[in-house]
Amino acid sequence: MGQKVNPCIFRTGPNLPRNWESVLYANKNNYSDFLLKILKIRKIINTEYSFAQITKILIEWPSSKNIVVNIYAKKIGVIIGKSGGDIEKLKQNIAKITSADVSINICEVKKPELEEAFIAQTIAQQLERRQSFKKVMKKAIHASMKQGAKGIKIICSGRLGGVEIARSESYKEGRVPLQTIRADIRYAFAEAITTYGVIGVKVWVYRCDVNQSRINEVK
């Protein structure tokens, strides 16, 4: 039987296309505490700023006294707020969890059509508005390929179109070589909460092949 593995974890490491999205220094006694706090931080950011279309959150925790949070999003104005008021509120919430000095960097995503999280979130939001899943999926694939993706695959599962029997529909364009480790493939998952149930959205985006000389330059 074939075994499935998360394509992001499969390609994460010092000599692989992806780096870790959370970097911290901990021992076996306090590692679980650090991990729980990081999960709380990610949940707060994704919940309070769900309309900012966040694509990635990088957390650097070099010591117990300092923590740096880098947020990549399409709509950075939603996170910053008026006169930076929302940023200060977010800093206070994170400081309560970590008891450390918090630094937050907001980065705007220039090509969101290539970001797997943005694609999955956009499809989920459109499905919640009862748009046709076929049109939504094809539109997302076309936009991603137009921006330079080498391949993309999208799967939607659930009661598509409100039918009684749940099923899965998939669309693919280009190549998505999941067995090639040097292939920079990004994966994301999102859920659409509809009146007739939850629809799961899975997205794979194949950006490029990473050569050994460039492998450390790719995030």
Curated annotation (Swiss-Prot):
Keywords: Ribonucleoprotein, Ribosomal protein, RNA-binding, rRNA-binding
Alphabetized CDD domains for the sequence: KH-II_30S_S3
Oligomer status and interactors: Part of the 30S ribosomal subunit. Forms a tight complex with proteins S10 and S14.
GO BP of this protein: translation
HAMAP family: Ribosomal_uS3_B
Protein name per Swiss-Prot or TrEMBL: Small ribosomal subunit protein uS3
Gene Ontology annotations for the cellular component aspect, listed alphabetically: cytosolic small ribosomal subunit
PROSITE patterns per UniProt: KH_TYPE_2
Physiological role: Binds the lower part of the 30S subunit head. Binds mRNA in the 70S ribosome, positioning it for translation.
Family: Belongs to the universal ribosomal protein uS3 family.
Record-linked NCBIfam families: rpsC_bact
